[in-house]
């Protein structure tokens, strides 16, 4: 399908000032509509939502932001790492810049985990939380033994980058696309091109990646929490939650094991137990990027949820 058809309704590109530069974002819909902040996945960018948002009700105001160091947003100041709480803080800064006191969050993958933490830390600010093949918080589970290794690896990576002071690699558009598809097999070719439109800059001899090379290991970008803290955090949550799981999605990306399965089941059971009718779970066929590869698959589900009030949306199951 022609990408221009998907981009219909785009209102504007935004640049929101932050102490280290700016947060870039793009907006669709009605300025007078209820606001929805859209959060992309790890190493992706705001173009992650280009195919989905035009299929949603256009009387909302959708803003898809680039996290710091991603897309067209400024990189963090030299010497500083990117921690989970910093991305959570970016949501608060964007809300302040847009003068939003209450809004909904829609996050894919890593964006859902950042949005979930924000929704627990600032519960009064979030009306609805939509998780697209994501989890609201990340449990330590089998990763707990590796956390220190992850932190060391990430810190050493930053120090090596600073010491080498090498310029970014310049490659051809085709090489860039094939590199993306090799490292992320669940992104289709057309969607890969869409992400690279915002994720790269054209120079005389090819393309360079826009993202900050300090952002390398997703484990440093997550806050791993205990099951006890998971329960406590959910008790603070005021938002209604729509949890859309892809049948071949997040757990496949994370190399599904018995431990991971148990963790996912614990999360879903706990969400149902604590949030009750405020939690709705839907599984759809597709992979981790189903919202890009097959946006019609999830658009109706999301639209129904956004348009619904306090009661569970008709036609959306509330159990896994």
Roles of regions detected by a PLM:
Residues 26-75:
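Conserved HGGG/HGGXW glycine-rich cap/lid loop of the alpha/beta-hydrolase fold
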Residues 132-169:
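A catalytic-pocket lid/entrance helix-loop region that shapes and gates access to the active site
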Residues 6-8, 14-19, 64-106, 300:
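Active-site loop/oxyanion-hole signature of alpha/beta-hydrolase fold enzymes
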Residues 199-275, 280-282:
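Conserved serine/cysteine hydrolase catalytic core
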Residues 55, 61, 100-146:
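Conserved hydrolase catalytic core segment
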Residues 1-38, 57-61, 100-101, 136, ...:
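Alpha/beta-hydrolase fold catalytic core
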Residues 163-224:
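Conserved alpha/beta-hydrolase catalytic His-Asp/Glu region
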Residues 286-299:
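Catalytic histidine-centered segment of alpha/beta-hydrolase-like enzymes
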